[in-house]
Amino acid sequence: MEPAGFVERLIPGPPSGSAIRHPPSARACLLVALACWRAAPAVAQERAPIVDSIIVRTYDVFDDSEAAANALFGVVNALRFRTRPEIVRRELLFRAGAPYDAVRVAETARNLRAIGIFRDVSIDTTRIEGRLAVVVETRDGWSTQLQLNGRSTGGEFTWSAGLIETNFLGTANVVGAVYRDDPDRTALTLRGRVNRAFGTRSLLDVAYDDRSDGEVGGWVVGVPFRALSDRHAVDLVGVVGRERVLQFRDGVRADSTERRVSFHRLQGAFAPRAGPDGYVRLSLAAQVKREEYVAYGAGGQNVPDSLSGAFGAAVEWLHPRFTVLTHYNGFAREEDVDLSTRVRVTVWVAPSGLGYARSGVGPQIEARSGVALGRSFLRARLEANQLFLSDRLDSARVRGSVTLAVLPIGRQATVLHLQAEARRGLPPGSEIDLGHGLGPRAFRSHAFTGTRGAWGTLEHRWFAWDELLGVIGVGFAGFLDYGGAWYGDQPRRLGGDVGLGLMIGATRASGTNVGRVDVAYRFGDGWTGNRWIVSVGRSLAY
């Protein structure tokens, strides 16, 4: 697709200050038109040179010079498979023989970074014997994740151990197994993901959770949208299993039920307008769900078994806008911050003849937008959905958030994040649940639960060193959190914390991978024990 204004640039206007004193003759007009027509290819060539060749270079976690200087770095490279060049080539949105398009080049770089296996992506141009060549270089991140994670908050400790390979045999496919232990349950999770099977746009993603109180399996298979210019997509989503649903009130478990579910959704989408400058997408969906809630021990809640079907239609509009930052969520790598304006409106229809006691209509809206302020940005998001039955409002949910990030000088970032949410009439287990890494960071799991909630955080980060010993980033942070959740029949429950933290990140790994050790002072509601605590876990990503 030609860049905006391309045609206009082919037709030069009169020189500045010139004046036409007499009407031109027909012969003069013909000569001018002929000259413009002959000049058009030259102008187009100057404005959009033709790409003669594309060179793809993939590099290991450590460059050859680094591996030669440090034997351990050489061993690390030898233990893994470098990403295959064809994995990079299949993501390219430009081709040899076509005009160079800077917008498509930028989108290609974003898509490559979004795969999550590279620590650095660069796309540049060069001239070889006078011809334009595009050089694509990727540097792998350490994608074999030996997970030995722990999180401690106020005397509560959770941990997980496992192995996940996000670049299996250099193909950008994912395999892994993780065991986790938290206060609610233990679980073994198996995961597999095949991107672009057989060189196509197709996707297969499966996961299985074997829990101490149930088991759940899920999958996604289809052909997703992978670029702004893609015209078609289709996917089939499924979830089958049984799981224990826990409900909490004032930080204490109040109820427990077992949910048995079989859910299947087929969705297809078409984009009547699609290109690097945005898209309009139309989609249709159909779903079938069998859901049952049964008592789990004494005091359980019973919800009747239901087999139901529904149909949905949606329209989505997007105008893309991105900014690239460093030292925002992680060390020594570029991060794509999505500031696009996107609006999606969906309407679900649930006829009474498909298992519902009454017919219902469920409108949904999602909207988000952002604006770059130099190296800073402001971003907002709103989501709302409701289900109207023939005689009443059955359920509803609304959530909004605002993030302001200020990066005044290199290696430092100040972030203000605010969000609020309200829910009504949703099934058990759908309550707002804050604590232990979600919401105020120095509080235990389920410290704040309810159908209404709000929280915010103000944090300043200093990424002091990117690569100590060539592999570790070290930084410091100060933070203030405040917020909570509560039910409609109780007063607001709000608590907060203020503290300092140490940030440690593996700069040669894929992803941001920043861990935290925080010392915090707690105030307000929702805490027990000592006001001063030490918490260990992952850094929040905004």
Whereabouts are the PLM-identified features?
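Transmembrane beta-barrel wall of Gram-negative outer-membrane proteins
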Residues: 193-299
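C-terminal transmembrane beta-barrel domains of outer membrane proteins
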Residues: 5-10, 92, 342-542
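Periplasmic polypeptide-binding modules associated with outer-membrane biogenesis and secretion
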Residues: 2, 6-11, 45-165, 176-180, ...
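Outer-membrane beta-barrel translocator domains and adjoining extracellular loop/strand segments
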Residues: 161, 187-192, 216-222, 234-237, ...
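Transmembrane beta-strand segments that form the barrel wall of outer-membrane beta-barrel proteins
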Residues: 91-92, 123-125, 142-152, 159-182, ...
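Outer-envelope beta-barrel architecture signal
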Residues: 50, 132, 142-144, 157, ...
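Feature captures outer-membrane beta-barrel proteins of Gram-negative bacteria and organelles
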Residues: 159-168, 186-199, 217-229, 234-236, ...
